[in-house]
Amino acid sequence: MPGLRRDRLLALLLLGALFSADLYFHLWPQVQRQLRPGERPAACPCSGRAPSASLHSAAASRDLGTASHNFSGALPRVEHPSRGHPAPRSKLQALFAHSLYQVLEDPPLLGPEDWLLASQEALRYYRRKVARWNRRHKIYKEQFNLTSLDPPLQFRPEASWVQFHLGINSHGLYSRSSLAISKLLHDMRHFPTISADYSQDEKALLGACDCSQIVKPSGVHLKLVLRFSDFGKAMFKPMRQQREEETPEDFFYFIDFQRHNAEIAAFHLDRILDFRRVPPTVGRLVNVTKEILEVTKNEILQSVFFVSPANNVCFFAKCPYMCKTEYAVCGNPHLLEGSLSAFLPSLNLAPRLSVPNPWIRSYSLSGKEEWELNPLYCDTVKQIYPYNSSNRLLGIIDMAVFDFLIGNMDRHHYEMFTKFGDDGYLIHLDNARGFGRHSQDEISILAPLAQCCMIKRKTLLHLQLLAQADYRLSDVMRESLLEDQLSPVLTEPHLLALDRRLQIILKTVEDCIEAHGERRVIAEGSAQRSAPDSGQANLTS
């Protein structure tokens, strides 16, 4: 019996020693870290160090599935990193809550003529498209003896791309309060692809050139149409240039690379300017093997895939755009960055007009256009239909402001929906040649503004607001781009260039006002009802 009691005592002592060691080496250090905030892990949301940009990006990507980022809605509150109490709301949140972004647009949306699509007609059209897809897919599988357990596609009217199309109206491609846009961005980022193909333009041009006559054989036009599992589709532009690279000085604008990150950033800037004329665009890491090669039915596209010496999967475009494998794009080994821009409604449903830009550049190695030589060129334009009897010229100037901010010299045409007539807005498509050189401000892009000395009051008020410290353009762009999966989308020099170029625009307007007077320069256009006093800016400052 004494021996048994001794064994029990030894066991209790051993357990006590183990518990003490665990308390000292594991529990006590955690208690100490909780008591000393400066020593908390870096990932803690209330620690002395802010989470990294990549964590912000990942969180934004996760939250898109459940949160609707309507532009006037509240963004998540951000805890102060050291004091532990709520910090002031973000600049992006404050911007979209400003009265300029709340005022009702004029004229109000009243009837069917204000919406691009007739909903019932559009839904019938899309149902037929899905049924035709299912028939063709079945024939394709039978032709090649393919077995697939995938059920036929079902058309869903609530799909985000359908709601985006039905929401296009006479004010813009989407409303400020649209809930479908956040869902569409999320779906394009995450939905699996079911097909990949060349665009219709590229199909029409395949083989219709002599590769030896190409000025610079490069992948500037390498792009694909991807269709997703919800039957939505987007234009995919792969990464051709690293973010840190600038366009060389001796490159002509018409042979510059098309940059995927420029397409993404252009959508965010367009939204911040409250134009809403750029189709929703996101970045995505695409598996070129699983999401392009294995789902395409185009034999030409299949034939241009190869494995590089570094064991990366690559593909290139056929003539006329480039003719050699050294101009291919490659995954790493399968994953490739790219931009995805949502398609607009079919031309069968919503015809568009493509119009040459009056300030088009000379697409030759020498020579200049009239506007580059004649400072009074705008007087001539004002005498020509439709610039003599509509707000079209103000739309051209809006587009010039947008292009100057992103540094896009390649706006040779613009498109409009024919339904909205001469006063309809210009759609800002194909922005991939923007953000090429942050160190140079191409003043010639502002020629429509400088020569015509006109600008919409609404546009000017937004520009002046974005020049204020509380709503600084570079800051709200930086914050907005954190939502994207490929963040950081722009390098810091490109963001700072936006502020510099904004000041140049405002100085140009100021010079116009000094020369011609405010009444001749500031145009009401088809902007909006009068904003509250808090939203008015000093037009001469």
Curated annotation (Swiss-Prot):
Location(s) in or outside the cell: Secreted; Golgi apparatus; Endoplasmic reticulum
Post-translational modification comment from the UniProt entry: N-glycosylated.
GO BP terms, alphabetized: biomineral tissue development; calcium ion homeostasis; enamel mineralization; positive regulation of protein phosphorylation; response to bacterium; tooth eruption
Intrachain disulfide bonds: C314-C330, C319-C323, C378-C452, C453-C512
Pfam family, one: Fam20C
GO CC entries: cytoplasm; endoplasmic reticulum; extracellular space; Golgi apparatus
GO terms for MF: protein serine/threonine kinase activator activity
Glycosylation sites: N70, N145, N287, N388, N538
Induction (free text): By all-trans retinoic acid (atRA) and IL3 in EML cell line.
Keywords attached to this entry: Biomineralization, Disulfide bond, Endoplasmic reticulum, Glycoprotein, Golgi apparatus, Secreted, Signal
Tissue specificity as recorded in UniProt: In the mammary gland, expressed at higher levels in lactating mice than in virgin mice. Observed throughout the tissues of the mandibular incisor, including the secretory and maturation stage ameloblasts, the suprabasal layers of the gingival epithelium and the odontoblasts. Weak expression in the enamel matrix.
Annotated family: Belongs to the FAM20 family.
Function comment: Pseudokinase that acts as an allosteric activator of the Golgi serine/threonine protein kinase FAM20C and is involved in biomineralization of teeth. Forms a complex with FAM20C and increases the ability of FAM20C to phosphorylate the proteins that form the 'matrix' that guides the deposition of the enamel minerals.
Subunit structure as annotated in this protein's UniProt entry: Interacts with FAM20C; probably forming a heterotetramer of 2 subunits of FAM20A and 2 subunits of FAM20C.
Name of the molecule in the record: Pseudokinase FAM20A
Gene assigned in the entry: Fam20a
